[in-house]
């Protein structure tokens, strides 16, 4: 006969009916495999093979099938980023604040000063993949909004800009490691077969903005394009000197400054490659000869002398960039139609520079004009669609040959979090502005974390239906106007109102590397967790009567009274600001005595899920269909939501095991009315997870496959099972008997599975019942040799071992108050390497 809901409740001993026998008789029956199989059949829990079509949507859950296309907002505002500069002497500042730091605090702070990321393999992608075509109908708008976002990050000192293969520029305050690369000298050496070419810079390794002006760059760009000697004063050179350079420089010398579109600019076919390279080498040598006044003997025996460039030789950059700039080629061209881009280019005389350079230049490892990840924009969050957020896709480091094993770190579980934060303190939470962008990244990691764009001309070439990209001639005057279209003209005119002359700047190609840790790499959450936990550890030791705790960028402060909390807030805020940590005071939230943290509400009574999660669960059950197979990917989403609140239900995670089984088998799951009603009843009444209290354990349980024994104070009990049971099942039953007979919330056991409180591997009915009975129970490990219940479980009641007085101390897991972390194992698998390739030649194991 079909199993009724009431019968199911009685099987789980959830009813107060009088038909059920003693617990010691009823509970072992729930471990019976045959009973579990029959219940699964009656509830339709095991019927995974269905022939009718699957349901792919339940309420808002669509699994991996996203039915809503991403929405582009032309009115997106680019968020502003403060000038974030974490103080380099952060350890000294912390020691001034709280005294000597612990070993763990120092180790964590050294880990992020600077952060390092050196994967063994990196895959380089063409610049065309820099900005992802996430919005096919809004390619131009998305391109410029993304470029503006990247420009904002660069101006805020969060990105490096690749200037040459071995140099980069940035804005903001430099760190010491950005000046002392390669022993503080800017030295470029090529291999012997490519000749010997050496340049020297200022000893600090920083080239100031004024020493490398646009005049040099524009002339270098001219030389790369192979212009005639009369087109630039630096391009002319004496034949004899040219010959000597030609003998020493390989014809395939890399281009020098910036990144230009492939094949851009009109190249005179009469100028061959070797003569172009010859002039390029001469110009490069002449240009670099004005960067410093020091002398150095090169390895080939030639002394190279450097002088300062007179300002009178500077020319406007726009003159030198006409031939390489796609934008400025429209300036003097004849309009092809009323929608020709030349109308837009000639709107104003001041078209702005082709390029911008940072306040500082540094030496970097060889960095190609490529990207290692793509970027695109999305809404900042579901509640803020007015601002955009940059999504960086460095997923290559999570798959394939370029996969990196990220370091693991502790996340507080629910019980540890409750033990730590469930108190009668008054709480507030701090908002750290752009938390990831606080942690500096070593410049040697730049070649692995590259983003950028190939320039507007390549995007226009994709849009244009009649564009011709043949023989690398795109950008020449012959097909310059092929990109003109009404759609592009209208888009650019609208964008012109927003960006003005920056349209010209943003239309150029660019390669950027991260100067602060990006959000799209698995190393970043680990580093952020180490950083904030170390800072909170320092704060806790400075104010031992208060509590500071963090998870990622979520920092909470607790004090015994509101006035005390406000004093603490002022002191901690001033301390964090002195370290260079930026807080957003407008987003500081005062919670009172019930803290909202990590999706939970935590008070002196314990922990419950936040209300918005409870409402989601109710909505899910309202939309949940019965007798219809639901796609296992949708089941994943349902289990994700229900699993978050499972610890607050009577039966816990074991109640969801049928769903887990269907997901593991990648089969559809059909909710029967009885199973849905059972789950719904579970989740409509949520019970708080209470804080564990310290105490002395005086109740012990033990079992053998054939019997069980209890020691409750000086009383001893024993019993036998009808049939032999697996040892873990027997131990779990003994613990349940101890809880039900004594009512104690502290039980001693020698079984590790019972200690773990994970009952999902037991027979389904027993797991649900055991979770119900043992909810809120704490366990203490007692060795078998010392367990007072060991003898009764073996049928020996006459022998009485002395009663142990086992103290129990609630654990806060690895999220302890003083940032204690386990020692590093002696051998680690291949993962991120923390030795800089600039100083150490790493060899694979």
UniProtKB/Swiss-Prot annotation:
Task: List GO molecular-function terms, semicolon-separated.
Answer: DNA binding; DNA-directed DNA polymerase activity; metal ion binding; RNA-directed DNA polymerase activity; RNA-DNA hybrid ribonuclease activity
- Site annotation (Priming of reverse-transcription by covalently linking the first nucleotide of the (-)DNA): which residues? 65
Domain Reverse transcriptase positions = 359-602
- Cite a single Pfam family from the UniProt record: DNA_pol_viral_N
Catalytic reaction annotation: DNA(n) + a 2'-deoxyribonucleoside 5'-triphosphate = DNA(n+1) + diphosphate; Endonucleolytic cleavage to 5'-phosphomonoester
Q: Recorded E.C. number(s)?
A: 2.7.7.7, 2.7.7.49, 3.1.26.4
Residue positions binding Mg(2+): 431, 553-554
Specify where the region named Polymerase/reverse transcriptase domain (RT) lies, as residue ranges: 349-692
Which Gene Ontology BP annotations are present? Answer: DNA replication; symbiont-mediated suppression of host innate immune response
Any remaining note in the record?
Answer: Hepadnaviral virions contain probably just one P protein molecule per particle.
The entry assigns this protein to a family as follows: Belongs to the hepadnaviridae P protein family.
The record's function comment reads: Multifunctional enzyme that converts the viral RNA genome into dsDNA in viral cytoplasmic capsids. This enzyme displays a DNA polymerase activity that can copy either DNA or RNA templates, and a ribonuclease H (RNase H) activity that cleaves the RNA strand of RNA-DNA heteroduplexes in a partially processive 3'- to 5'-endonucleasic mode. Neo-synthesized pregenomic RNA (pgRNA) are encapsidated together with the P protein, and reverse-transcribed inside the nucleocapsid.
Q: Which PANTHER family match?
A: PEPTIDASE A2 DOMAIN-CONTAINING PROTEIN-RELATED (PTHR33064:SF29), POL PROTEIN (PTHR33064)
From the Swiss-Prot or TrEMBL record, give the protein name: Protein P
Which species is listed as the source?
Hepatitis B virus genotype A2 subtype adw2 (isolate Germany/991/1990) (HBV-A)
Q: Supply the source organism's classification.
A: Viruses, Riboviria, Pararnavirae, Artverviricota, Revtraviricetes
